[in-house]
């Protein structure tokens, strides 16, 4: 049986990346909540960055 998680960086960024979050009102709310909480990584696209 094929496993459910078939990783793809492109799909991951398109669905959960920063630009995808900024597109919708709900996504912007997620970002603002994560900023308020003080998250180092706001979205999956931040994982590439050096801190």
Curated annotation (Swiss-Prot):
Entry's Gene Ontology BP terms: translation
Return the PROSITE patterns for the record: RIBOSOMAL_L34
Write down the HAMAP family for this protein, in alphabetical order: Ribosomal_bL34 (MF_00391)
What family is reported? Belongs to the bacterial ribosomal protein bL34 family.
- For this UniProt record, give its keywords in alphabetical order, as a comma-separated list: Ribonucleoprotein, Ribosomal protein
Q: Does the keyword Ribosomal protein apply?
A: yes
GO cellular component terms given for this protein: ribonucleoprotein complex; ribosome
Q: Which domain of life is it from?
A: Bacteria
* InterPro entries assigned: Ribosomal_bL34, Ribosomal_bL34_CS
Which GO molecular function annotation, any one, does this entry have? structural constituent of ribosome
The keyword Chloroplast is annotated on this UniProt entry: no
Q: What is this protein called?
A: Large ribosomal subunit protein bL34
